[in-house]
Amino acid sequence: DVFRMNGHDRHRIRLRLGMLAHNLLVEEYPLAERDLAPDGESHWLLETEVAGFAGVARFVAGLLDDVEIVDSPELKRYVADYFRRNAAVIAD
């Protein structure tokens, strides 16, 4: 997938990205550019399929204030579970 993950399962995701998230996505994952569409003056929508949530979740977690998960409840649960599992690490 565009986040360089592989596997047989496919999950459709949709993210709304601010300018920072958009620029970092295109720089770090150039294949994502084909799945991006403008959404107003300073936002973009990424609609793509991923092989697993680990790669995209890492991207979302690092830019949480500039990425909105849209119509992707499985990804929302994955990210929320990731933060719950690791809460002790960031609480110390």
What are the residue ranges of the model-derived segments?
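Polybasic (Lys/Arg-rich)
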Residues: 1-92
